[in-house]
UniProtKB/Swiss-Prot annotation:
Molecular-function GO term, any one: peptidyl-tRNA hydrolase activity
GO biological process: protein quality control for misfolded or incompletely synthesized proteins; rescue of stalled ribosome
Organism encoding this protein: Bordetella pertussis (strain Tohama I / ATCC BAA-589 / NCTC 13251)
UniProt keyword annotation of Lipid metabolism present: no
NCBIfam families attached to this UniProt entry: pth
Protein name in the entry: Peptidyl-tRNA hydrolase
InterPro entries, alphabetized: Pept_tRNA_hydro, Pept_tRNA_hydro_CS, Pept_tRNA_hydro_sf
Quaternary assembly: Monomer.
Membrane among keywords: no
Gene (name only): pth
Source species taxonomy: Bacteria, Pseudomonadati, Pseudomonadota, Betaproteobacteria, Burkholderiales
Key words of the record: Cytoplasm, Hydrolase, RNA-binding, tRNA-binding
Subcellular location: Cytoplasm
Annotated site, Discriminates between blocked and unblocked aminoacyl-tRNA, chain positions: N30
Its biological purpose: Hydrolyzes ribosome-free peptidyl-tRNAs (with 1 or more amino acids incorporated), which drop off the ribosome during protein synthesis, or as a result of ribosome stalling.
Pfam families: Pept_tRNA_hydro (PF01195)
Length: 215
């Protein structure tokens, strides 16, 4: 059972350094029960919790090639999206939604699994490359810009975890119990700072998340 953390409205003047507020939150993953518990679906896991926190629910929107949830936070519209195009075609869904709502890349936050961070670690980043993550690569092509925000949820790398698996196999398998607990803890930390990101205060969100990484 998912624990719900209802967001409270936060006044914009509570934040000192502001970026563009986030209006589209995209959780990356693969659709269907075969993939539900796999590491590659960490973005879906967080998106599901955020829908609960924002008191909304996902529904299929075929025209957007994904599951969509609409919410209000601090008087503003927020859209949550889980593409059902499979990871490699995520941009088809993200591009369609961003175009319809006339959103700039800077107003988009993508939640995704990150091989270069260990389970229990998380980082916020804007722009940059895709580091071989095909979902990010396709979104960058669809938006015509790398300047969207990313919330990188650490899942570890087979090499860093002492496993002999190939990366393609690793991301399509569930984490072990200890790793899952570490990822779940990170997801709760992310949920706690999403209100700041929705208000555009990525400086606060970054301090809170990166400071708790212990790195």
């Amino acid at each position: 059972m998912r624990r719900v953390l209802y967001f409270t409205n936060t006044r914009p003047d509570a934040y000192a350094t502001m970026s563009d507020p986030i209006r589209l939150i995209v959780g990356l993953g693969n659709p269907g029960p075969d993939y539900e518990t796999t590491r590659h679906n960490a973005g879906f896991w967080l998106a599901d919790h955020l829908a609960d926190d924002l008191r909304t629910a996902f529904a299929l929107e075929k025209g957007f090639f994904g599951m969509l949830a609409k919410a209000r936070h601090a008087g503003e519209n927020v859209v949550l999206l889980k593409p059902i195009t499979y990871m490699n075609r995520s941009g088809q869904s993200v591009g369609a939604v961003a175009c319809f709502y006339k959103l700039a890349p800077e107003q988009v936050l993508v939640l995704h699994d990150e091989l270069d961070l260990l389970p229990g670690q998380v980082k916020i980043k804007q722009g940059g490359g895709h580091a071989g993550h095909n979902g990010l690569k396709d979104i960058q092509a669809a938006l015509g810009s790398p300047n969207f925000w990313r919330l990188r949820i650490g899942i570890g790398h087979p090499r860093s975890l002492g496993l002999a698996q190939q990366v393609a196999d690793f991301v399509l398998h569930p984490p072990c119990r200890e790793e899952q607990q570490q990822i779940d803890t990170v997801i709760d930390r992310c949920r706690a700072v999403v209100p700041a990101m929705l208000a555009g205060d990525f400086a606060l969100a970054t301090r809170e998340l990166h400071g708790a990484n212990g790195t």
